[in-house]
Amino acid sequence: MIRHLHRLPGWQRLSLYATGAVMLATGLLWLVLHYAPGGSAGELPHPLEAWTMKLHGLAAFAGLFMLGVVAGSHVPHGWRSSARHRWAHQRGSGLALCALGALLALSGYLLYYFAPEALRPALGWAHSGAGVAMAAMLVKHGRRSSQ
């Protein structure tokens, strides 16, 4: 039996983890800069906040590309093969990753273009929580498939 029947090719795995790491790091850095006491000068935002968001947005474009790559190859192949093998438990975490990716894309779009000021903080925290959850789920999903 093949040990890693539907494992991502090396370039996809590296690109996915690198993109995810940049998105997670820039998102968490923005939270620290924005909400940490003394992080900003009074009412003015920290000078690095804008650059952090620009890098986060750039990484998000790469993340959407990688989501498309994975959705086009890994997801269908993994779905078909997991029904016949011991990797059926991977379906749940794979579906959760797809749902979180869609939620992050939608909430990021809403935050950037449409979020009213009254909803912006709650939507931002939901986006942040989903991002951290997706990072944890991605590591868990990858480790399960390598076992």
Give the positions of each predicted feature:
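Membrane-embedded alpha-helical bundles that constitute the cytochrome b-like, heme-associated redox core
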Residues: 1-147
